[in-house]
């Protein structure tokens, strides 16, 4: 029971889970059970946000005739060697609203969030596919991570 004024969550896979033995990484975090497309085996780490596609702004790939971009953003700070830390903690304040949880109630409150995926590209940093068609573990990934932290906002809370 209680009155909640906000929520805090992390985008990414925390460092403790990232360095735990593979046998302890179950469900969607098990790289051998369908989660391999969101895991870097070469870097022993998870991809937090993945975007791939084509853009008129990306450089031309002559063999394919396409203009591809590939963004695989991860890194949690490193296990034995320091790396970038692209884990992002997001705090959503409910403002003047309160989510009231009561044992006697048959329904739980709901916080409705908006996810503006475009913010990944045009948040505090405008992403330029011309200059950065491929982003993975390089320093530029921190710009993308700072952008995805900004993509989630509160629409409203209701308690009925």
Whereabouts are the PLM-identified features?
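A short, solvent-exposed, low-complexity linear motif enriched for acidic/polar residues
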Residues: 1-160
């Amino acid at each position: 029971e209680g009155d909640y004024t906000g929520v805090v969550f992390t985008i990414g896979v925390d460092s403790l889970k990232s360095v735990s033995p593979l046998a302890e990484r179950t469900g969607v975090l098990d790289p051998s059970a369908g989660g391999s497309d969101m895991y870097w085996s070469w870097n022993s780490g998870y991809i937090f946000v993945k975007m791939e596609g084509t853009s008129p702004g990306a450089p031309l790939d002559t063999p394919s005739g396409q203009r591809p971009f590939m963004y695989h953003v991860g890194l949690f700070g490193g296990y034995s060697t320091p790396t970038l830390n692209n884990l992002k903690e997001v705090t959503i304040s409910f403002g003047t609203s309160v989510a009231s949880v009561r044992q006697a109630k048959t329904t739980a409150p709901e916080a409705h969030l908006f996810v503006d995926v475009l913010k990944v590209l045009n948040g505090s940093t405008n992403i330029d596919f011309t200059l950065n068609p491929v982003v993975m573990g390089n320093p530029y990934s921190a710009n993308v991570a700072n952008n995805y932290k900004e993509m989630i906002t509160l629409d409203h809370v209701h308690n009925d």
